[in-house]
Structures are given as C-alpha cells and as structure tokens.
Amino acid sequence: GIDTGILRNFSDSALAKLIGYMKDKNFTAVRKWLGESDIEPTEFFRAFFDKAEDHIAKGSMPQLVLHLAKYQYQNAFAADPEINLMACLTEIMADCEFL
C-alpha cells in the first residue's frame, strides 16, 4: 500500500509520480493515485502550488493558479472532496503544459 506518512508531507516523489500521470494525460492513473492517497485537499492545493514551478511550463502557471484557487474555494462546499480534487486535476491536465 501507500505510505500515508509520505503523502501527508506530499513528498517530491509522490508529487513526481502524480505529475508524471498528469503529463501523460492518464486520467485512470491520476484517479487511482488520488483514491489511494489520503492527502488532505487543503494541504494538497498548497503543496501543489508550492512545487508546481518545477513541473509546469511558465506560460501555464497563471492558468494553474486559477484552477487551484477555484477548486480550493469549492472544496469548502464539496459533498465529496475527492471528486472536487479530481475535477481540479482533470482541468489542470487539460489546460496546463507540463515540463
């Protein structure tokens, strides 16, 4: 299984794995990764924002920020935060260029 201690800290290796799936537009793998992780959505949004510069093209950063802000806000009202977070990752996969 997945080491939840590593995911709570949203390690670089966990992020790299997720980013790899997103770069490949592998929706199924992203969904599986998210389902197996127990990362807190608020923690995720912050960590993804902090580490995104290393993985997202500069020209895509404004779009990334807009997606993260929108879904971070919606998270407060989401009946199922995992679905909300998956929607966020799906939009980022569709709209952002990965390095």
Segments the model singles out, each with a brief description of its role:
Residues 18-99:
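Helix-rich C-terminal "collar"/helical-bundle subdomain used as an assembly and partner-interaction module
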Residues 1-19, 62-66:
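Conserved C-terminal helix/linker of AAA+ ATPases
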